[in-house]
Amino acid sequence: AETYSEGQSEKNIGDLLSALPVKDKFYISSKARLDPKSSESFGSQIDRKLDNSLKRLKTDKLDLYQLHNKITFEEGVETLTSAQILEKNGVCDIMEKIKEDSRVDHIGLTALGDTKPIRDVVNTGCFDTAQIYYNLLNPTATFKEKGIWNDQDFSNLVSDCQTQNMGILGIRVFAAGLLATDIRHGREIPVTHMIDIKEEERRVQRIYKVVGQTYGNRAQLAVRYGLSAESLHCTVLGLATLEHLQ
C-alpha cells in the first residue's frame, strides 16, 4: 500500500523487482486509502496515488489495485459508505476507468467495516477481488450462518464473492500478531466490532491451550489455518524478516 512507511515499502519492492530477470513474472498489487474529508476529488486522489505507486514500483501497470478504506454505514475520517462507492461517478466508476486506461488489470476492495454495506458493494459485481478477514479468532466469513459466534458476523461474505466470481484474499491471518507470538508491538488493534484486545488475548490463550504444538508453533498454526480454507484463493502475509519467511 502507498501508505506503508510513507511509500518506502513500495520503493523497496520496486528496487528489488527491477533487479530481477525480466522472465521472472510476479503479480504486483497495491492499495489506496482515500480521504473523504479532502477537497480533492476521489478521481484526482486515485490518479495521483496510483501514478505515485507505479513510479515507486518501477512499472507501468499493476495486476491488482485495491481500495484500502473500510466500508461503513456512515462516512468516517478514513471510511466510505456503500453509496460513495456505488453512486454514479463514485469510487467504483473511477476505478473502472483506471482499468480501461490500462494502468491496472483488476480492481479490489478491503472487506472491513460494517458487514451489510460491505456485502452490498460485493453483490454489485463491481470489484474483481476482496480482501477478507479470516483467522482463528474469526472465521465467520466462510460461514453460512453466524450461529453462536459473538464477534462481528461476516457470514455469507465469501459466498457472495463466489457468486460474483471474485478473487478472495484472506487477510489478518495473524490477527496483527496476536496469534503469532507473545511479543507485542503496540499496534494490536482489533478490526472487528464486538470484542476488545483483552478478550482477543484471552481467546488466543484458549486456542493454544487446546491445540498445543500439534501443528507447529503459533505462527505456523495460524498460517496453516488460513491456508486450510479452500474457499480462499490466497492468504496475504506480512513478513518483516527472512526468518519470518523461513
Role assignments for model-derived ranges:
Residues 1-26:
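N-terminal binding-site loop/beta-alpha segment at the start of enzyme catalytic domains
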Residues 70-246:
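Beta/alpha (TIM)-barrel catalytic core signal, keyed to glycine-rich beta->alpha loops juxtaposed to Asp/Glu
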Residues 24-37, 136:
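A short, structured active-site edge motif that brings together acidic residues
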Residues 23-26, 60-64, 105-106:
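Short acidic capping loops at alpha-helix termini that bridge into adjacent secondary structure
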Residues 45-66, 97, 101:
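CE4/NodB-like, metal-dependent polysaccharide N-deacetylase domain
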Residues 41-56, 113-121, 222:
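Short, acidic/polar
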Residues 9, 13, 46, 50, ...:
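Aromatic/hydrophobic pocket-lining residues that form the small-molecule binding cavity
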Residues 4-5, 35-38, 113:
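Glycine-/small-residue-rich active-site loops that bind phosphorylated ligands and cofactors
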